[in-house]
Amino acid sequence: RNGDEPMMRVLAAAGADATKSNRFGVTPLMAAACLDYYEGETAGPFSGVPEPQRLEAVKLALALGNQINARTTFGDYKMIGTPETTLLRYPDNFQDLVDLGTGDPRFAEMTALHGAVICNQPSIVKYLIEQGAEVNARNRLGWTPLMISGGLYIANAHKTSPGSAQILREALAAQGLNRR
């Protein structure tokens, strides 16, 4: 199960490297915040945990030394399309990228905050911002967490995060940043 805080504690107690990322740069914090798996992505049963438990996993990952603004590393592949259009469909040159074995290349340079927004988890969005997450972080395609909150086509569905959008707008305004 993703975001499983009790299992994370067991693994850390057994000596697992609590900051080790996978080959795409996804850290335990990112996975806990939901930048790993999206309900509806596969036909199987719900495999995550409720948002309050996932929030505890996020807190634990930070306490264990994960960097709050770490970025994914899906590769440095040219992707064609605007930030706005690639939120709703794959890059125009997706056929050139599909066999590279990188997963969804649109997720290059994402942060834990991006993941929390994708999964519509406002409590985690708020907590990450309070802990210093870069509110206006842009991925390789230029997506910000606020842009994602307005809608992202992923796992054969259009996902929005209206609760996160309000938190992000308030944080951006408090920091005097662009509200995009």
Positions of PLM-derived features:
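Solvent-exposed, polar/charged alpha-helical surfaces in well-ordered, non-transmembrane soluble domains
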Residues: 6-9, 30, 56-59, 123-126, ...
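Leucine-rich solenoid repeat scaffolds
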Residues: 136-179
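Extracellular/periplasmic ectodomains of large secreted or surface enzymes and adhesion receptors
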Residues: 70-81, 91-92, 173, 178-180
